[in-house]
């Protein structure tokens, strides 16, 4: 696991959908680098935390696009420009090969 010196980000007062089908709840999320460290109804902020108040906003895990043909873009050298709009919409994962074939292949 790589070491990170990223400042901890505390997201406060968000309406949190955790992906479990449980009802949303208002709470806080503590993030460091690319890791979620804690999710709780309330997390006390340390002096070194960057704090963002999300009151009135919702927070959810990344969405999975289960039917997409974006695997064809993955082969392009400039693929980032094709995937960036999906990331802005909250889509972090694509299922490829869902029509019986894929441009990118599969790992064992």
Residue ranges and their predicted role:
Residues 2-9, 16-62:
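Histidine-rich, glycine-flanked metal-binding segment
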Residues 27, 74-76, 99:
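Hydrophobic alpha-helical membrane-insertion segments
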Residues 46, 72-74, 102-106:
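Short active-site-adjacent helix-start/loop capping segments
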């Amino acid at each position: 696991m790589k070491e990170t010196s990223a400042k901890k980000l505390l997201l406060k007062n968000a309406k949190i959908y955790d992906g479990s089908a449980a009802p949303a709840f208002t709470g806080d999320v503590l993030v460091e680098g690319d890791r979620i460290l804690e999710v709780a109804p309330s997390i006390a902020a340390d002096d070194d935390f960057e704090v963002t108040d999300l009151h009135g906003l919702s927070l959810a895990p990344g969405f999975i696009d289960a039917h997409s043909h974006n695997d064809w873009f993955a082969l392009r050298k400039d693929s980032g420009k094709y995937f960036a709009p999906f990331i802005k919409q909250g889509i972090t994962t694509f299922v490829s090969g869902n029509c019986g074939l894929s441009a990118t292949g599969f790992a064992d």
